[in-house]
Amino acid sequence: LAVMTCSNYPAGYFNVYAEIAKLNDIDAALHLGDYIYEYPRDGYASQDAVALNRLVEPKTETVTLTDYRSRYAIYRRDADLQAMHAAVPLIAVWDDHEFANDAWIGGAENHDPATEGPFSARRAVALQAYHEWMPVRLNDPTKNDRIYRSFDFGDLVSLHMLDTRLIGRE
């Protein structure tokens, strides 16, 4: 397995995806969350984004379905990330930034209901975009916030994917 987490597009370092794509001795890539970050263009870890030509879209914080779709799309334009997705199966789980910083069951540190509406609406559109862009099969399509699943790699490893963020954190 190749394991990665915390993929902040403006900061760069997606070259690791190209290296994963070159590996011929792994069964899968495992992304442990923060596949995208919701911050606006001048937000967290963006100081080098202009020089690296890695400006996020939309330039605002992601809040709407269109925002989240655009953010996934800009990430997927990265040639190294495309190479990894083409070369190896991806097993993924979300953390907080697929929704908003420090998300929990009913809200997030980086969500203001007064200006961004109810967190439940943001959570719903973030979940929809996640499932549109990420290769995750649901055990129950009526419960898109339940991504518990298991993967067996022969008799060597049993990998159990858990959600310790959206439904596991109060």
Residue ranges of model-derived segments:
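Metal-dependent phosphoester/phosphodiester hydrolase catalytic core
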Residues: 1-170
